Amino acid sequence: LVGSEMCIRDSLTGIRPTKIPMKLLEEGKSREEIYRYMKDTYFASDEKIELATDIAERENAILKKIDYDNGYSLYIGIPFCPTTCLYCSFTSYPLVSWKNRVDAYLDALEREIDYTAAKFYHKNLNSIYIGGGTPTTLEPYQLDRLIRKIKCSFDLSDCLEFTVEAGRPDSITREKLEVLRKWGISRISINPQTMQQRTLDLIGRRHSVEQTVESFKIAREPVSYTHLRAHETELH
């Protein structure tokens, strides 16, 4: 199958293929040298080479601005999901069982935010990542409450990226996206994990492929896509 479309398309599967051009950029390689390496080594298509290299250059530009000596990054976890995926090992709980405890969790989270802000007041906050779980399981007013608290508690003048993981398409609504836009969130991540409906059903992802496409459309912003080859039926 060498040289076939299937071989070319499958040659860059796996986690973070942009690490390849990123490493080459760090070594001082030019775009032409990166192109030739990825073409000869991975049989990658021109489209994938260009995309991976473009993203690597953007990442590299951000990384150069990070204050590694006096900076820090903040992770905030929202441990709730619409359902629990079959493969998941993260600390996460079905929202249906914990819905009446979410506001209490946010109360505790706000106290921890106050503590963290006081502890690191003398350092530069470089990036914020709200992950999970699925942060967009929060209601719009809860998302607004959380982000407002973050914005009021930390100095974000040196913050290069503010990410909210919108990992489940079935948790995304226009109202929630409007909250994120209002607060100037610079990056969201919509993760279908797979575009095969049979795999979604097998792993307990209670959304459709069509919902993923619709979520991308209403977001109308560049998003990250994690494709998890979660089942042997996707190997063919």
Predicted regions and their residues:
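Conserved small/polar residues in nucleotide/adenosyl-binding loops
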Residues: L1-D10, T226-T233
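Conserved catalytic motifs of the protein kinase core domain
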Residues: G3, G71, C159
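Glycine-rich beta-alpha loop elements in corrinoid/cobalamin-binding modules
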Residues: S4-E5, R9-D40
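Short aromatic/hydrophobic contact patches that present stacked aromatics
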Residues: M22, S73-Y75, T163
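N-terminal [4Fe-4S]-dependent radical SAM core
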Residues: E26-L74
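Local cysteine-cluster metal-coordination motifs and their immediate loop/turn environment
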Residues: G77-S92
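Conserved non-cysteine loop/helix-boundary elements of the Radical SAM core domain that shape
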Residues: S92-E232
